[in-house]
Amino acid sequence: NLARRLGEVIARFHGLDSARAEGLKTLISELQLASDERLREWVTKHYADLPSLPVAKCPVMVHHVPRFLSMRRSSGESKIALLVFDGLAVDQWVQIRQSLARRTPKLGFDESACFAWLPTLTSVSRQALFSGLKPREFADTIDTTSPEPNQWSRFWQDQGLRVNEVLYRKGIKRIDQLADLDAGLSEPLIK
């Protein structure tokens, strides 16, 4: 997984002191340019095949994520949470993951990456992510994120859950909001 490895390298680079980082700036920039070019070539050849690939091992595109989570529930996992960080680069996630691992060693991570729909617009990616639908299936609301709560709830109702067993929270930006989230996730009814 080139993106993950590159993210790890860039995160380590950003963790260096300025004197050590200065000597690597050009190399890191060249590495990023080369990986961008490789991705462009790969997308040109393979992107059209992605939407229809199977989801069994992990989601390939954002609209596969809900089905993948549903399969995990069907395999016996009683509670599943999906955390979405808008606009987060892989190297930024590496730093967050490392910090969380230090602070909460019992917390486990199940990480994978998937492709967004092109062009990568927030409203398209988020609606695909929460609904499990392809963009043409939500064309009427493609320019907004407001349908997300209903799409998330509808997806899980279609999988057999009741509306009061599904939780959706958006816009958690402050630490003081975490207590409310924790209370919601701790509800016995929430799946």
What is each of the regions a protein language model found here?
Residues 60-79:
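A short acidic-Thr-Gly-centered motif at the start of a beta-strand
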Residues 96-103:
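Short secondary-structure boundary/capping segments
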Residues 44-64:
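Glycine-rich phosphate-binding "P-loop"
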Residues 1-48, 102, 108, 115-191:
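His/Asp/Glu-rich, glycine-adjacent segments
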Residues 64-68, 87, 128:
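Residue-level preference for alpha-helix termini and adjacent loops
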Residues 77-96, 129, 191:
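Beta-strand elements within well-structured catalytic alpha/beta cores of enzymes
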